[in-house]
Regions:
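Substrate-binding/active-site groove segments that recognize
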Residues: 88-105, 119, 123
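Extracytoplasmic
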Residues: 65-68, 90, 138-140
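A short, structured beta-strand-centered segment in the mid-to-C-terminal lobe
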Residues: 105-115
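N-terminal export signals and maturation junctions of secreted/periplasmic proteins
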Residues: 2-58, 82, 98-106
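Low-complexity, Gly/Ser/Thr/Pro-rich intrinsically disordered linker/tail segments
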Residues: 192-239
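Export/targeting segments at the very N-terminus of extracytoplasmic proteins
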Residues: 29-80, 113-134, 222, 227-233, ...
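Catalytic and substrate-binding regions of cell-wall glycan-acting enzymes that process beta-1,4-linked
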Residues: 141-208
Length: 239
């Protein structure tokens, strides 16, 4: 099942979509994600096809992305199902056609080899952009927030973790264009059904900190425990 609400547009710059302790910067200028100590979480077991495993290994080597992160994204987005379709998102990594083209995709978006390669290139690009902005590589969860909520949404969540999550989404450029209803659905549509009971107030009762922490735990369940994405990617022979 995809972790992304089906109708969120993520093609624009602001488009929506473990055990290690670390301190979080207090200054808003840092706008760093503060999830706190990562708890030990029971691992979920997901079996991928040999074809997808091979694609993940090749993409990891080509783009210097941790295999653990790529596997976790695939598990959360589609369970490894290459035929998955959620609204306007397709394949193992639930890419839109716009994303697919932007990051060099050709041929069949449902092809797990192609879908994985494009997704890894996209995540590498987003990881590098994060590093330039914040002076460090992103955690797997931070990278997933960018993938799911968009660059603008992720930045707002990190800068204002104790604000209502939907309000942070509404204050992005895309949120202002599409309105509060869209922003609320961008959050509540990404709260799994089995997690909603802990938020009796509904979407109004979930802060960005709670939203990010919920996804950090899910990421950890699927093995996305690498502290940082790898640096120094080599793309098409150029570092």
């Amino acid at each position: 099942m995809s972790g992304r609400f089906a109708e969120i547009s993520k093609d624009g710059a602001t488009g929506a979509r473990r055990k290690r302790s670390h301190s979080c910067a207090a200054a808003i200028v840092g706008a760093l994600l503060c999830i706190g100590s990562e708890p030990q979480i029971a691992q979920a077991s997901v079996q991928f096809s040999p074809q997808l495993e091979g694609a993940i290994q090749r993409a990891s080597e080509r783009y210097s992305m941790p295999q653990s992160t790529l596997r976790a994204f695939a598990a959360i987005e589609s369970g490894g199902n290459s035929r998955a379709k959620t609204g306007s998102y397709y394949g193992v990594y639930q890419l839109s056609h716009g994303e697919f083209r932007k990051y060099g995709g050709h041929g069949n978006i449902f092809d797990p080899k192609v879908n994985t390669d494009v997704a890894a290139r996209k995540l590498r690009s987003e990881s590098d952009a994060f590093s330039l902005q914040y002076g460090r590589a992103p955690t797997a969860t931070e990278l997933y927030m960018i993938h799911q909520q968009g660059v603008g949404g992720a930045a707002m969540h990190m800068a204002n973790p104790d604000w209502p999550a939907w309000l942070n989404m509404y204050l992005t450029d895309e949120g202002r264009q599409k309105g509060p209803g869209w922003a609320r659905l961008a959050i509540w549509g990404n709260v799994p059904a089995d997690q909603r009971a802990q938020f009796p107030g509904g979407v109004d009762g979930i802060t960005s900190r709670q939203f990010m922490d919920m996804w950090a735990k899910k990421m950890a369940r699927f093995g996305g425990s690498a502290r940082d994405a790898y640096a120094g990617a080599v793309v098409d022979g150029v570092q």
